[in-house]
Amino acid sequence: MSVKIVIKPNTYFDSVSLMSISTRANKLDGVEQAFVAMATEMNKGVLKNLGLLTPELEQAKNGDLMIVINGKSGADNEQLLVEIEELFNTKAQSGSHEARYATIGSAKKHIPESNLAVISVNGLFAAREARQALQNDLNVMLFSDNVSVEDELALKQLAHEKGLLMMGPDCGTAIINGAALCFGNAVRRGNIGIVGASGTGSQELSVRIHEFGGGVSQLIGTGGRDLSEKIGGLMMLDAIGMLENDPQTEIIALISKPPAPAVARKVLERARACRKPVVVCFLDRGETPVDEQGLQFARGTKEAALKAVMLSGVKQENLDLHTLNQPLIADVRARLQPQQKYIRGLFCGGTLCDETMFAVMEKHGDVYSNIQPDPEFRLKDINRSIKHTFLDFGDDDFTNGKPHPMIDPTNRISRLIEEARDPEVAVIVMDFVLGFGSHEDPVGSTIETIKEAKAIAAAEGRELIILAYVLGTDLDTPSLEQQSQMLLDAGVILASSSTNTGLLAREFICKGEEA
């Protein structure tokens, strides 16, 4: 094995840039494996697991950049290094910035009218940069993760005192005055404001609102821990107030994974007091509360979008609600062999994984996952599926030192082949997320592997059902229609929404009396 190691002292690049560069580096001819990352302890741990950690790399400091190249046999590592370093130059030249500043303070001084900072830095420095932005009267979207709960609480308290947004940490989705930040979809402007403690959940809600003829005024992300007991929903509470006073917003929709009970009560109390109608979608398996005056509840993202657009004036009778295709369900059941009884979910989006998993759990037992709220059914080994298994490839379990699957789907692609070889698997469920920040061709990057997976099953005399959901709109690039057609041409069954994905998957595998 021929390995080239370069350490660039005090050379910082944000995680989003490094994810993109690392993905492109691994596609270069002659590269067996390339690792481009900051020298954090977490990233060193990844190198150790790969057998690439050397004493030299071990001594590198957090602010140092590591480039590790494992070239294929006969490859020239020096030339590969030149090509990888050129990727940094391309990244710098393609940026839309007009100037560079050493600090947030100096940027604010030169652009005094600016009011928002998007921060993606090493988690060790993220709180410091976010605090500096808030002190300069800037709203903050903090993409960085690995920020302590204590720092998050302090930042959100400071933002609250100053009347500013503190979106994050680990906030990946927002739409502010029509501009999508980090991950987001091209949706029409409208009068529905979204507050989301869930990235892909917020994207899904915005996309369904768009499909149903509504539009989005603002989408404010809070970060996934906002509704925890320690944070207390500070950002969601403040965001409700901001949207209540936003002249562009007439309806407010809230979405989150299950919040802490005390925080849920606090948020609902604030929602009841809001002068504008509020739709609440807290994804879980519990009973959906009864609607109240000015406050409506939704069991899933599709229902939340429907209620929001109806409040905005859209008539339900004019909508295609995509009811389940019963003839299709019967046909799929007939095509499965008796031993095929399990669902395997391979997801990029955490909320999409949750919503599908919860739907299956309503009808079937033995549902395992790396994000299962029930410890009894949380996977002990994420590399081995058990019975019904749902994997969130965007969780830290899989992204530790690696790009998010919405940017680089490599991890999920290899797992697809592994699951296809299991004769007890009936259905594999996959999501494909379009939009700003995502892979430029998510379906195209996976389609050949999908064909290979189906061929593996066919060679053993069984049919592997692949059920896919494409999260996107007609305005996204690539388009929803183009990506969907590629899947249909490969014999993949398409679901029309995240909600319908779970409902279809659970029905496909029903046998005997269950059916």
Swiss-Prot record:
SUPFAM superfamilies: Succinyl-CoA synthetase domains (SSF52210). It holds the Pfam family Ligase_CoA. Transmembrane segments: none annotated. One of its GO terms (molecular function) is succinate-CoA ligase (GDP-forming) activity. GO terms for biological process: tricarboxylic acid cycle. One of its GO terms (cellular component) is succinate-CoA ligase complex (ADP-forming). InterPro entries: CoA-bd (IPR003781), SUCC_ACL_C (IPR005811), Succinyl-CoA_synth-like (IPR016102). Belongs to the AllF family. This is Uncharacterized protein YahF. It comes from Escherichia coli (strain K12). The lineage of its organism: Bacteria, Pseudomonadati, Pseudomonadota, Gammaproteobacteria, Enterobacterales.
